[in-house]
């Protein structure tokens, strides 16, 4: 299936900008720039929303303002308004179980302990929707998990993050032309790990 709604997960306050947990926001921001898609604060959708023609089809972008743990509310509002099949919703988010620079695209799956994904699965009533996980790596032990996830990338990590964003936007663009299954086979073996 071809994605019609691309959701980046993150937290809305400026203090969360450029944190590991907001890498989903960073990906859809990069898509908006590439596709010259403007954001506007959409009250009904509880998030920043943009739409345009990408790959010859209407495609929507969403960054929920509901905070990570309630992301499903915003996504559900868009799905209901546009009468979308959950399988046409591609969710982009961070995964600390993947090393920095690695991405994994899947057509379905569990929340894997990610609270944003738990909210989406609960509000959509299914886990059968595609997701693109971007590796943020685990803490080196000097800080706890929450501090790691909500922390900013180090200067030495930023070049890898930029390459990850490029690879993620390339994978999403490919999925709009060729679907999730073909994109998985091409991009799941590629990464920008050091």
UniProtKB/Swiss-Prot annotation:
Q: Which PROSITE patterns match?
A: PEPT_TRNA_HYDROL_1, PEPT_TRNA_HYDROL_2
> Which residues of this protein are catalytic?
21 (proton acceptor)
**What Pfam families does this protein map onto?**
Pept_tRNA_hydro
Q: Which SUPFAM superfamilies match?
A: Peptidyl-tRNA hydrolase-like
Keywords from the named record: Cytoplasm, Hydrolase, RNA-binding, tRNA-binding
GO MF, any single term:
tRNA binding
Task: State where tRNA binds.
Answer: 16, 67, 69, 115
Return the similarity comment.
Belongs to the PTH family.
EC number(s) from the headed UniProt entry: 3.1.1.29
Q: Which GO terms describe its biological process?
A: protein quality control for misfolded or incompletely synthesized proteins; rescue of stalled ribosome
This protein's assembly is summarised as: Monomer.
Site feature Discriminates between blocked and unblocked aminoacyl-tRNA, where: 11
User: Which gene name does the record give?
Assistant: pth
- Species of provenance: Synechocystis sp. (strain ATCC 27184 / PCC 6803 / Kazusa)
Q: What is this protein called?
A: Peptidyl-tRNA hydrolase
Q: Which GO terms describe its cellular component?
A: cytoplasm
Biological classification of the source: Bacteria, Bacillati, Cyanobacteriota, Cyanophyceae, Synechococcales
Query: According to its UniProt record, where is this protein located?
Result: Cytoplasm
Q: Where is this site: Stabilizes the basic form of H active site to accept a proton?
A: 94
Q: What does this protein do?
A: Hydrolyzes ribosome-free peptidyl-tRNAs (with 1 or more amino acids incorporated), which drop off the ribosome during protein synthesis, or as a result of ribosome stalling.
Among InterPro entries, the record links this protein to:
Pept_tRNA_hydro, Pept_tRNA_hydro_CS, Pept_tRNA_hydro_sf
